Structure formats: C-alpha cells, structure tokens
Amino acid sequence: SEKITVFQKNFQVTENSSHFV
C-alpha cells in the first residue's frame, strides 16, 4: 500500500512537472 502511494505521488509529481514545463 505504501509503495503504491509513493508511486502514485511520484506519478502525480511527474505529470505536474510536465504541465509546468
């Protein structure tokens, strides 16, 4: 569960960064 949360958070951060760029 924790791993999934971290993965999801990391994915969201990547998406946010992509949008920011």
Swiss-Prot record:
Molecular function terms, GO-annotated: chlorophyllase activity
Keywords: Chlorophyll catabolism, Hydrolase
Domain of life: Eukaryota
The protein's annotated pathway: Porphyrin-containing compound metabolism; chlorophyll degradation
EC number: 3.1.1.14
UniProt GO BP: chlorophyll catabolic process
Keyword Glycoprotein: no
Catalytic reaction list: a chlorophyll + H2O = a chlorophyllide + phytol + H(+)
pH and activity: Optimum pH is 6.6-8.6 for chlorophyll a hydrolysis, and 6.6-7.6 for chlorophyll b hydrolysis.
Physiological role: Catalyzes the hydrolysis of ester bond in chlorophyll to yield chlorophyllide and phytol.
Similarity comment text for this entry: Belongs to the AB hydrolase superfamily. Lipase family.
Record protein name field: Chlorophyllase type 2
Organism for this UniProt entry: Chenopodium album (Fat hen)
